């Protein structure tokens, strides 16, 4: 009697276990986000133009802006923005003679500043021009591929379509301003000249 009851109980347990083994599922959604980000880096932070900035008459050579652009391209500046409607500003400081005081000509009527302007692109996307004040809004994302060897990931510079030609200059309000004059009738004072180009990227949406 006791044995029969035990067998019956075991059979019931097997029935319960069999019912519990039926498949059941539950999915859980995962929500996350990627924040808009921008970044910029350069493999070189100093470039040097090998040639004299002037011709035999001490006037600015016509190829100086292109030489600056080529030197900057060689620095391999990599930039990205993973969102849209990003702010991009390229600032250039005019080439200034070391030791220059004020923003006018020096003794003898020689110029001591050179104005030039650059247009910048990345992977075929126009970024900004130093020929205009302020930042540009770049609607599309750019710089998604991480590669130092691929020029399509680099900020590429070229002589600006507007006021890009190099020229002796004076009386700009700041080194990066667009209001530097054009002194086409001036020679350049001898000395070392320095300038700079700054790339500023700010994420949009």
Residue locations for each model-derived region?
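Bacterial N-terminal signal peptides that target proteins for export
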Residues: 1-8
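Short non-domain terminal segments
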Residues: 4, 108-111, 140, 155
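N-terminal signal peptide c-region/cleavage motif recognized by signal peptidases
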Residues: 17-19
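N-terminal small/polar-rich segments of proteins
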Residues: 22-125, 160-205
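Extended, solvent-exposed segments with strong compositional bias
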Residues: 126-165
């Amino acid at each position: 009697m006791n044995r029969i009851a035990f067998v019956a109980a075991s059979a019931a347990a097997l029935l319960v276990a069999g019912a519990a083994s039926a498949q059941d599922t539950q999915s859980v959604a995962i929500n996350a986000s990627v924040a808009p980000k921008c970044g910029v880096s350069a493999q070189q932070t100093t470039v040097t133009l090998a040639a004299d900035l002037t011709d035999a008459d001490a006037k600015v050579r016509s190829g100086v802006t292109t030489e600056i652009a080529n030197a900057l391209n060689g620095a391999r500046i990599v930039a990205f923005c993973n969102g849209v409607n990003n702010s991009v500003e390229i600032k250039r400081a005019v080439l200034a003679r070391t030791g220059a005081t004020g923003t006018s000509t020096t003794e003898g009527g020689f110029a001591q500043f050179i104005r030039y302007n650059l247009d910048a692109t990345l992977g075929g996307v126009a970024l900004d021009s130093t020929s205009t004040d302020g930042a540009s809004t770049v609607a599309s994302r750019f710089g998604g591929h991480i590669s130092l060897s691929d020029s399509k990931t680099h900020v590429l510079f070229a002589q600006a379509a507007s006021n890009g030609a190099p020229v002796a200059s004076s009386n700009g309000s700041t080194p990066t301003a667009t209001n530097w004059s054009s002194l086409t009738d001036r020679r350049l004072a001898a000395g070392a000249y320095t300038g700079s180009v700054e790339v500023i990227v700010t994420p949009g949406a």
